[in-house]
Every structure is written in C-alpha cells, then in structure tokens.
C-alpha cells in the first residue's frame, strides 16, 4: 500500500473493494503490510489500528481476562486502561511508580514490586504497565516480563510513546524485544504517521490471540480508513528501507540540543538512568520567576509553557507541576531545535533559585 503525501485524500478514500483487502479479514495487501510491520518490530503478529492505541489497549485487556478477574495495573496507566477495567468489570490491583523527589517526577515501576504483588495476590490474571511514560520514564520491561512469566501470566505494555524504540542504539529496544506478550504502539506520536494510527503486537503462547482479534473486530471501526492504513504502511516503508538515513541525523540533532540545554544555569533537563532521550523534560523545580508580580512564588511548568508559547511561539507537548515536556521526533529540524535552545537560554535568566 502506497500513497503520495500530496495526493488528494478524496481520491484515495476507498473502502473494501476488490483487490484492496479487508482489515478485519486480511488475506491480501493488508495481511502483507501487517506481516512486514511485525517483522520490523520483532513481533510474532501485528495488527494495524485506526482507532488509536486506545482500541489496542481495550482489546488487549479484554482478550486476556474474564469478567471479575484481577489485573495488576501500574497506577500511572492511560485512562483507556481504566475504561477497559470498567467495561470488563475487572478488579485492579495497583502498582505505584516510585517518586523522585529531586526531579519531582514519578519514575519507573520496579520488577521487585511486580513480584511482591503477584505473590500477595495469586488470583491476578495479567500484568499491565506503561513504558515509556508520558514523561519518558522507561521501566525494566525484560525483568517485569520475567516476573509475569514466572507465574504464567501475560504482560501487556502500553508503549504508545515508544514507537521509535529499537530503531537506533540511542533509544531503548522495544517491548517486543524485551519479552512482552502484547505491545501497543502509537505510530503517530513519535513517527511520521497520521493521528490515531497505531499498532498492536502479540508474542508467545500466553495470550489467547483469537480472543484479542475478536475484540479488535468488535471495538475497531468496521469502516477503517484506507488513508490511515496507507499512512501506517508508508511509515513502515520508511523504517524498513530508510531507517538509518532518517534516524542518524535526528539523533545527532537531538544530542546537540540536549548538550546545549544542559548548559543552562537554572532550568535543567530532568532525566533518570532509564529514560527516553527523545523527550526533553525541562524542569523549573526549586526556581522562582524573577518578576515583581510573582512575589517570589515557586515557578511552575504552566508558567514556563506559557512563556514559551506567548513569547517564542513554541508549543510544548504538556506542562505539569514544575516541568514541561518538549517532544521531539525524526520530523524535527535544526532550525526548530535552535529556536528552542535560544528561548530556554533567554528564559534561564528569568527563572532563578
């Protein structure tokens, strides 16, 4: 499946006509496209999603549990996880991420906590975590998968923000490579693909794959957009044949950007040992904004976000507490990163201890 980026969308907005396959019963070009995606992502089986990672998470959880089951859930999971728990009348057992008081960030889920919970609650039927988090925190998926598999349980990883993992050594391997049983990727978040496009991957023999497929059929649109699916396939084409030429210059730009931002005297890059370096988490923790109308009040992420938008026309991904997140991707340019560096340098003079 190929589509020119400058094509008129109305001319390619087809449906399941002869020769163009059917996403819900893929036997032709869509089957081939999904098999290629599986190969690229080191998965046993991959499905295109046109209703976002949300439909993948809903289908994954429904597919590995039955009504009334217990499920071990990281408390920092996406709201779709809680929607799945509600819809399937599950009983969640919560895993709380550790908190870094210096960074003012929730950090990773530990494998030790997973093992402790599984021993305490033997009725748990599946484990659900998010890695990387919105803030870029990466948990030890391999060790968590091992802990789940010791009990014969499947591990579902919401890796929506890690669709770029595994394509350059600067970033972690993806959760398929780490032993997860179901992995969900939002290709639109960190790769060049249309909004709401995603992938669901399945691995191993701990998952009832037919049950997951059944929920995908029920929960995903019966009229999937061929524009969105062609966009996914075009993204896979890039990863398959142009990975180095796309990722190598991006990583070099990102390294330079992080190095320059690291020179700031006050605003700092917040990161942990296990971190997705594509996320620029800019922290003003412990600082005040040196303006008369703030009366020395502690600076906030919201203030920094507003300054970047209103003064420099730079839109951040989000702001929370004492930090903002600037998301980067292979689509970023030298010019864009230089604008961010210049803005932060100037604001660094206004935010002080």
Task: Describe the role of every protein-language-model region.
Residues 1-41:
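Glycine-rich phosphate-binding segment of PLP-dependent enzymes
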Residues 4, 13, 25, 40-43, ...:
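Conserved PLP-enzyme active-site core in the AAT-like
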Residues 20, 47-49, 127-130, 325-329:
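Short glycine-rich or small-residue beta-strand-to-loop segments that form or flank ligand, phosphate
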Residues 33-34, 44-50:
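Short N-terminal amphipathic alpha-helices
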Residues 34, 172, 305:
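Generic structural marker for isolated residues within well-ordered, non-membrane alpha-helices
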Residues 49-51, 95, 319:
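Conserved beta-strand termini and adjacent loop/short-helix elements that scaffold enzyme active sites
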Residues 256-353:
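Conserved C-terminal alpha-helix-loop-beta "cap" of PLP-dependent enzymes
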């Amino acid at each position: 499946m190929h589509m020119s980026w400058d094509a008129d969308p109305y001319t390619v907005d087809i449906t399941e006509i002869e020769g163009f396959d059917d996403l819900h019963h893929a036997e032709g070009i869509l089957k081939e496209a999904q098999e290629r995606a599986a190969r690229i992502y080191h998965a046993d089986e991959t499905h295109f999603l046109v209703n976002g990672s949300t439909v993948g998470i809903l289908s994954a959880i429904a597919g590995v549990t039955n009504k009334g089951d217990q499920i071990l859930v990281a408390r920092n999971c996406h709201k779709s996880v809680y929607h799945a728990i509600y819809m399937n009348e599950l009983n969640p057992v919560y895993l709380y991420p550790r908190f870094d008081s210096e960074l003012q960030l929730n950090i990773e889920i530990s494998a030790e906590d997973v093992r402790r919970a599984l021993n305490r609650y033997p009725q748990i039927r599946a484990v659900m975590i998010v890695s990387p988090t919105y803030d870029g925190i990466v948990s030890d998926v391999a060790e968590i998968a091992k802990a789940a598999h010791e009990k014969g349980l499947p591990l579902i990883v919401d890796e929506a923000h890690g669709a770029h993992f595994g394509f350059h050594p600067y970033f972690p391997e993806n959760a398929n490579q780490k032993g997860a049983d179901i992995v969900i990727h939002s290709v639109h978040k960190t790769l060049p693909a249309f909004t709401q496009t995603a992938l669901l991957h399945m691995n191993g023999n701990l998952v009832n794959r037919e049950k997951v497929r059944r929920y995908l059929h029920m929960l995903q649109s019966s009229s999937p957009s061929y524009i969105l699916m062609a966009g996914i396939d075009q993204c896979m084409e890039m990863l398959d044949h142009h990975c180095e030429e796309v990722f190598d210059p991006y990583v070099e730009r990102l390294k330079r950007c992080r190095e320059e931002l690291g020179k700031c005297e006050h605003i700092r890059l917040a990161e942990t040992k296990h971190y997705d370096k594509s996320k620029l988490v800019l922290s003003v923790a412990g600082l005040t904004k040196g303006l008369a109308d703030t009366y020395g009040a502690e600076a906030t992420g919201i203030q920094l976000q507003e300054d970047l938008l209103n003064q420099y026309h730079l839109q951040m991904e989000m702001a929370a507490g004492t930090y903002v997140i600037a998301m980067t991707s292979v689509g970023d340019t030298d010019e864009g990163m230089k604008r961010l560096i210049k803005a932060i340098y100037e604001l660094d003079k206004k935010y002080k201890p």
